[in-house]
Amino acid sequence: MNRVTAHTGSKYPIIQAPMGWIARSQLASAVCNAGGFGVIETSSGEVDNCKAEIEKMSELTDQPFGVNLPLLFLRDESMVEFCVQHGVKFVTTSAGDPSKYIDILKYAGITVYHAVPSVEGAIKAADCGVDGLVVEGTEGGGFKSPEEVGLFVLIQAIRKQIDLPIIAAGGIADGAGMAAAFAVGACLLYTSDAADDSIR
């Protein structure tokens, strides 16, 4: 167990990326049941569907899971309250200022990690009181810094400034990438791989 798995409760230090329209209950529960940490997306903006997917998780797994809240694209703020009311224990925020909902989430006992593409963003997130960081290098999907800093360089730069647990996001696809991420200070790894039932 490391600092991030202590927060997620997952067996393995692997977290499934919250890909829009893809990271729904089928994928997230499969990851959870395999020992990783599944995350439900809300970036699609399909609020009712995403809420239904969160509710389905209790039927598909008895393992902990998370929800991603992309702040710039959160079309319905009721999603935040829904997470609180439905016992979600881990939230990743991204694409915006985490201070907007940090007090509500933390008051409810929810662990909050914020996705950052830069050292400056990491410092701001830490100052807001997040519990950890999703450090996203230029190799990853989603929103990245125009400075295009590689993941391993970015993790090391942030680690020198901030002592928060780090999830590494971007371009990690095999054991060598995992080992490298752990070596530079990551505690958990984002992966975006998806498989159908025949090869899950």
Language-model segments: which ranges?
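Surface cap/lid and interfacial helix-loop subdomains adjacent to catalytic sites
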Residues: 157, 184, 198-200
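A generic structured-segment signal
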Residues: 163-167, 177, 193
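Active-site entrance/lid segments in N-terminal catalytic domains of soluble metabolic enzymes
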Residues: 1-161, 165
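Catalytic cores of alpha/beta
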Residues: 120-128, 173-185
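Active-site-proximal beta-strands of protease catalytic cores
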Residues: 133, 185-189
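Glycine-rich adenosine-cofactor-binding loop
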Residues: 168-172
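Single conserved hydrophobic/aromatic residue that forms the stacking wall/gate
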Residues: 190-200
